[in-house]
Amino acid sequence: MLARWSREIKRTIDLASQLRYARMSAALYNKRVYTDTEEWIHHTNGGGAHIGITDNAVDQLGEIVFIEYQFEPGDKVEKGDDMIFVESVKATEAIQAPFDLKLLENNVGLEDSLDALNEKPEDTWLVKVERKDDSFTL
C-alpha cells in the first residue's frame, strides 16, 4: 500500500511540474519582454516574435534618420549577430539578435518613412523572426 501511495504522489508531482511548465510557456507567448539593451520582443504563438526598440532607446538616440538591415528574409541569424544598424542624429547603434533565429521579414516600410519609429517606437516592429530554440529567457 505504501508503494501505491508513493507512485500516486510521484504522479501528482509530475503533473504539477508539467502544469507549471505549460503556464510558464503560455506566459511567454503573446507577451512583450524587454532586454537590457532597450529592445522589446513580442513573442507570438508558434515560435514567432516581433522585435523593436523602446521609447527610452529613441529618447537616448534622438531622432532616427536611417536604418540598415544586415540580413534578408530566410537568413539564419545567430545570437549576438548585428541584425540592424540604427543611425540617429547622435549615434549609430547596432541591434543584435537576442537569440538564434530565422529572419521572416524586415519592416521595409521604415526605409521610406521613419516617422512611426520616431513617434511610437513601442508600436513599430523592426523585424519579424522565428525562434530557433526555446531557450530565450530574461
Put a short name on every predicted segment:
Residues 11-85, 115-138:
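Acidic, low-complexity mobile loops and tails
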Residues 56, 91, 108-109, 134:
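Residue-level signature for short turns and capping positions that connect secondary-structure elements
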Residues 38, 64-65, 96-105:
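Generic structural motif
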